[in-house]
Amino acid sequence: MSQPITRENFDEWMIPVYAPAPFIPVRGEGSRLWDQQGKEYIDFAGGIAVNALGHAHPELREALNEQASKFWHTGNGYTNEPVLRLAKKLIDATFADRVFFCNSGAEANEAALKLARKFAHDRYGSHKSGIVAFKNAFHGRTLFTVSAGGQPAYSQDFAPLPPDIHHAAYNDINSASALIDDATCAVIVEPIQGEGGVVPASNAFLQGLRELCDRHNALLIFDEVQTGVGRTGELYAYMHYGVTPDLLTTAKALGGGFPVGALLATEECASVMTVGTHGTTYGGNPLASAVAGKVLDLINTPEMLNGVKQRHDWFVERLNSINHHYGLFSEVRGLGLLIGCVLNADYAGQAKQISQEAAKAGVMVLIAGGNVVRFAPALNVSEEEVTTGLDRFAAACEHFVSRGSS
């Protein structure tokens, strides 16, 4: 008989780069999870915007099981039918002409930044290497992507960092304009800063970046790892803004819980990449591709995308009502089902404590820094699940406020 697994085993066996919750989920269905003790949770965290169709979706299970019964992996010396079907679906649904598949958002962003450097080197010369990114951004945990993310807390322990990366203020086109010039090879930006506090870009800001990139022959990269695959009520957030990038990165919800990432590119951009310039062993494997193909089939429909916008209204209306009663938040912001509740000055820095109270009440939420409680639920979360989950969140807020005043 195997040894029982407990939360304490994490602290004993794992490299301590995470501080997970005190409970261990063991089973999920839809937007509900159950832990080892059988306690039920409504999941508004969605695996950090990953579980776009909830837990154990029957059609995703079927797609995975069907491919698992055939073959799992061959490596990049061979292609496979599921990955080619997935590539065609992404190309047909977006601006892209070409796709590179990998395993995560960080890998997709790494590929985008490498492509941008190579594009500039081949077309204009090695002097054109500057990358402009934004303060409080998050693009992944590789050395290149953590350097592009404008959060020193994630990068300062790993110096020396890759050079020629510059950070402007987000949503400030004048700040960006001061850094973008003819030596800039690329600008990388999140249409909504997720980890940075659920901060949507303005239309004018993204349009201004597009114009600056065109003027200086720089590539515009949209990091849609968190905003992509229906999260904002459009398949990709660039469609909401009406600003088309040269490169787009996607992951998280693309696999619905199965690890997969992709870089989408125009033909012109992709043309500089040749055999051997980049690669990955697992990227585009048939298991991930089969699941992701089914995810796109289910999400890229008018009914699903319009439903995201409807669910946004359910959340925002109720969160504003909760705030009316307890006075925790200065703002409820976001697009679609990426929503942030910004704590007011009286409760600054206490988002983690609120998320912990929420878990005790039976609802899972995220944070985005110390001042923002973040919601990234399944796109198909039911009205009953929204009501029940927000009832529990309201109870958590009541307990948090009463505890603080006692």
UniProtKB/Swiss-Prot annotation:
Pfam families tied to this protein: Aminotran_3
Keywords for the protein's UniProt record, in alphabetical order: Aminotransferase, Arginine metabolism, Pyridoxal phosphate, Transferase
Catalytically driven reaction(s): N(2)-succinyl-L-ornithine + 2-oxoglutarate = N-succinyl-L-glutamate 5-semialdehyde + L-glutamate
Protein family according to the UniProt entry: Belongs to the class-III pyridoxal-phosphate-dependent aminotransferase family. AstC subfamily.
Superkingdom of this protein's organism: Bacteria
Role, per record: Catalyzes the transamination of N(2)-succinylornithine and alpha-ketoglutarate into N(2)-succinylglutamate semialdehyde and glutamate. Can also act as an acetylornithine aminotransferase.
Pathway(s): Amino-acid degradation; L-arginine degradation via AST pathway; L-glutamate and succinate from L-arginine: step 3/5
PANTHER family assigned: AMINOTRANSFERASE CLASS III, SUCCINYLORNITHINE TRANSAMINASE
Keyword Transferase: yes
Name of the protein in question: Succinylornithine transaminase
N6-(pyridoxal phosphate)lysine PTM sites in chain numbering: 252
Entry-linked InterPro entries: Ac/SucOrn_transaminase_bac, AcOrn/SuccOrn_fam, Aminotrans_3, Aminotrans_3_PPA_site, Class-III_PLP-dep_AT, PyrdxlP-dep_Trfase, PyrdxlP-dep_Trfase_major, PyrdxlP-dep_Trfase_small
GO process terms (BP): alpha-amino acid biosynthetic process; arginine catabolic process to glutamate; arginine catabolic process to succinate; ornithine catabolic process
GO molecular function: identical protein binding; pyridoxal phosphate binding; succinylornithine transaminase activity
NCBIfam families reported in the protein's UniProt record: arg_catab_astC, argD, PRK01278.1, PRK05093.1, PRK12381.1
Gene3D superfamilies named in the record: Aspartate Aminotransferase, domain 1, Type I PLP-dependent aspartate aminotransferase-like (Major domain)
Disulfide bonds: none
Co-factor(s): pyridoxal 5'-phosphate
EC number, UniProt record: 2.6.1.81
Enzyme class: transferase
